[in-house]
Amino acid sequence: MKKTPSPTDEETQLFRDAIKGTRKIKQDTIRADLRPVKQKRELRESREKLGVDHYFSDEYQPHLEADGPTRYVREDVSKFELKKLKRGSYPPEIYLDLHGMNQQQAKQELAALLTLCQKENIHVASVMHGIGKHILKQRIPSWLAQHPNVQAFHQAPREWGGDSAILVLLDIEE
């Protein structure tokens, strides 16, 4: 690299004449007001809560077949897609583990997962609810059936969680 030539005496004098009359800044630290950040965070949290409450109602009970594994297919989707999901033809691209979460936390995480899948164009997700007291195992299918982007879901094959997980096929807008 080339070295920058040092300024001549004439250039130095011109610079000093140009800044004549200026004074040193005593303190240049600017203290930003944190209120806008807090307002943005509160707005984002309220939007997230709205999304959870909008899609996932606890009162809604979809018609899910009681016999056999947990499964659902939207009316406008081919039942063949459900079979492919059951066989494991669609490997999950993302996993969500809900072990140890309460219903509200699980709802928020599920909403965040579906939003992320939409943003990242992810078509198949695995939601691991665990065995436990069967609370999440019963709630998650009813929540998923309410979401407009969920085409189908089926109890996961053994290699992806078996009884303690659900594979979800999503309808992602390109």
From Swiss-Prot:
PROSITE patterns noted in UniProt: SMR
The EC number(s) this enzyme carries: 3.1.-.-
Pfam families xref list: Smr
Keyword line: Endonuclease, Hydrolase, Nuclease, RNA-binding, rRNA-binding
GO molecular function, one term: RNA endonuclease activity
InterPro entries: Smr_dom, Smr_dom_sf, SmrB-like
SMART domains per UniProt: SMR
Oligomeric and partner information: Associates with collided ribosomes, but not with correctly translating polysomes.
Keyword RNA-binding part of the UniProt annotation: yes
Organism: Aeromonas hydrophila subsp. hydrophila (strain ATCC 7966 / DSM 30187 / BCRC 13018 / CCUG 14551 / JCM 1027 / KCTC 2358 / NCIMB 9240 / NCTC 8049)
GO biological process: rescue of stalled ribosome
The protein's name in its UniProt record: Ribosome rescue factor SmrB
Function: Acts as a ribosome collision sensor. Detects stalled/collided disomes (pairs of ribosomes where the leading ribosome is stalled and a second ribosome has collided with it) and endonucleolytically cleaves mRNA at the 5' boundary of the stalled ribosome. Stalled/collided disomes form a new interface (primarily via the 30S subunits) that binds SmrB. Cleaved mRNA becomes available for tmRNA ligation, leading to ribosomal subunit dissociation and rescue of stalled ribosomes.
Annotated family: Belongs to the SmrB family.
Intrachain disulfide bonds: none
Claim: rRNA-binding is one of the keywords in the record: yes
Domain Smr: 96-171
Taxon lineage: Bacteria, Pseudomonadati, Pseudomonadota, Gammaproteobacteria, Aeromonadales
